[in-house]
């Protein structure tokens, strides 16, 4: 069957590597709880020559920003399932363009000969900028391998829940 006409109001063209990176760095933080549909998607913002993907389930928050030329500012919430499908279809070794076209409350994604049409998630995404403090009182440096090893050891004692919390105490000159 042929797709219906989709005369887009707005359109964004992204390089495949860029959108893969944006998806990879944010999708894990999305909720899977359909009772709160707003958090099952990724907030996509275009403004000031940058594109930002934001994912949260209210316990985790992930933000990834990259340079992106855009003629106008826009904001939308794309379902995480659509973004997973985009990532799954970006398998070619050759560079590909991903075209996102918006019309009312729908998005059409074109990757080579693949076309995905979906509804956007309606609602107002929480202001994630207010969650992050403008300045931090404590700064610390650590060895990533040592921290990863410590987290793996502590994880053995944590429950299998989604939100295992590790408390880190930092003393003076430690």
Q: Model segments located where?
A:
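Structural preference for solvent-exposed beta-strand-turn elements
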Residues: 1-174
């Amino acid at each position: 069957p042929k797709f219906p006409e989709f005369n887009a109001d707005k359109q964004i063209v992204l390089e495949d590597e860029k959108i893969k990176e944006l998806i990879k760095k944010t999708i894990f933080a999305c909720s899977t709880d359909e009772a709160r549909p707003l958090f099952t998607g990724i907030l996509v913002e275009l403004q000031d020559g940058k594109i930002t993907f934001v994912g949260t389930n209210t316990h985790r928050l992930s933000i990834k920003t990259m340079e992106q030329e855009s003629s106008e500012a826009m904001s939308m919430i794309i379902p995480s399932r659509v973004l997973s499908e985009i990532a799954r279809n970006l398998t070619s070794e050759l560079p590909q363009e991903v075209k996102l076209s918006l019309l009312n409350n729908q998005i059409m994604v074109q990757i080579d000969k693949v076309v995905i049409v979906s509804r956007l998630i309606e609602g107002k995404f929480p202001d994630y900028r207010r969650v992050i403090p403008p300045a931090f009182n404590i700064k610390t440096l650590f060895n990533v391998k040592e921290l990863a090893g410590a987290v793996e050891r502590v994880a053995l004692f944590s429950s299998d829940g989604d939100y295992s919390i590790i408390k880190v105490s930092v003393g003076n000159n430690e």
